[in-house]
Amino acid sequence: MKLYFVRHGRTEWNEEGRIQGANGDSPLLESSIQQLEALGRHLSQTYFDAAYSSDLPRAVHTAQIILEQNQHPISLQETPALQEWRLGRLEGRKIVELKALYPEEMKAFRHNLAEFHHDIFGAESVEETTQRTENFIKSLKDQSGEAILIVGHGANLTASIRTLLGYKPEELRKNGGLTNASVTILTTDDFEHFNLLQWNDTSYLED
């Protein structure tokens, strides 16, 4: 089975440098909608046996744009299990301001999640955010077919995908985070062991 993970398109809050989390949301930028249409065309011949997205509007809209371009129509299923990392009091605030107020915590969130003290902000722990998404992914083991589309969010997907690949918390951000509208592909035979086929790819924009 191939799992196609897509981070949602760039939003107004992304442009403003604000943390969205699970309780904040903002519309996709027009430029990002065009990118997602290009991604949809890039994946248009891929036969998805199922398609899932976070139930947050920016992810749902992203998934809908991709599926509208596909040659094999399929319904989208939404789930809170794929929501962005629930970041409590960090949500809605500008990253530049948070770096000034909490330099060590923001550094940890970006580079070493083992040192991120989530409780300061009333946020999910790294274990909580990855476990809910990992549990959902593993629940798909009885899904028949060869390909599944999964649309979610940057912080949660970066940590969750690398957790599926066996990385420790301090290693989850080692290669940085996922880019908006990027595609990451994992393969699995048993939904217990996963292999990385493609990471954070946006090469379709060069076509």
Where are these regions (language model features)?
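Extreme N-terminal starter segment of soluble prokaryotic enzymes
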Residues: M1-Y4
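Active-site metal-binding loops of divalent metal-dependent hydrolases
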Residues: G9, G154, T202
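Loop-to-helix element that buttresses phosphate recognition and phosphoryl-transfer chemistry
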Residues: R10-I65, F121-E134
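Phosphate-coordination/substrate-recognition cap region in phosphate-metabolizing enzymes
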Residues: A38-K107
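Glycine-rich phosphate-binding loop signature in dinucleotide/nucleotide-binding domains
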Residues: Q45-Y47, L140-A147
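Acidic, low-complexity terminal tails and accessory targeting/binding regions
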Residues: E68, H72, L87-A100, E146, ...
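Short glycine/proline- and acidic residue-enriched helix-loop micro-motifs
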Residues: K107-E128
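GST superfamily/GST-like fold recognition
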Residues: G154-T158, N195
